[in-house]
Amino acid sequence: MRSDGLAFYIHPPKYKSHSWEQRKLGEVGTTYTGLSGKTKEDFGHGNGQFVTYMNVFSNPVGLPDMTEAVEIDDSQNKVLFGDVLFTTSSETPEEVGMSSVWLENAENTYLNSFCFGYRPTVEFNPYYLAYMLRSSSMRKKITFLAQGISRYNISKNKMMDIEIPIPKIEEQKQIGSYFRNLDNLITLHQRKYNKLQNVKKSMLEKMFPKNGSNIPEIRFA
């Protein structure tokens, strides 16, 4: 086992006899709409929050700090823990129908108007859902449904006809954990990379003489 926890086996013996079930999204969950009937005056204040389009578009797992304020409105659909959020339009077909799983328990959380929500009615590992829906095979299925010319849209009803692979819950957990660990490692190394870039930038300024000087600020002994 590698120290970073990323070692895995292809076709582990305990799962060899378990074929993955194929079910339509609409058979294992229900949908709901984002905010409706709002004007720009309704946003930017209030004790509620809504998940932004860019949060859904950019993150397999939604970020709690990428929300914006909105007034509480009990007539609107609320986003709950474990919901999957989908974008409904984009400038290119390859970017339509991007998904994000919401794993926060915050009250009075809503969804922006340019997305729709999906609530599973059977047990899923949320991290499995997050990464499976962004896999290359699923993205091809979703992209195929995109319609438009200058801007592309996707039908919620057609999305619900897409078949998804559903392994046993224990295998889902292992898959979800594996990709979650990968993302954590990527984030860690990205932070290290950013720090090293800052060090390099600083040293480029200090290890060469500035204009008007012939002595650098920092030099080797």
Residue ranges of model-derived segments:
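Extracellular/lumenal glycan-associated surfaces
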Residues: 173-185, 189-192
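Charged, alpha-helix-forming regions
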Residues: 2, 8-16, 204, 210-221
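Non-catalytic DNA-recognition/assembly elements of restriction-modification systems
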Residues: 14-35, 221
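Short, solvent-exposed loop/turn positions at domain surfaces
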Residues: 11-14, 37, 72-73, 148
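Short, ligand-facing micro-motifs at secondary-structure edges
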Residues: 58-71, 84-111, 116, 127-131, ...
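A short glycine-rich beta-alpha junction/loop motif
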Residues: 36-39, 109-114, 146-173
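Extended intrinsically disordered, low-complexity coil regions enriched in Ser, Thr, Gly, Ala
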Residues: 186-201, 209-214
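Sequence-specific dsDNA recognition surfaces
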Residues: 26-39, 54-84
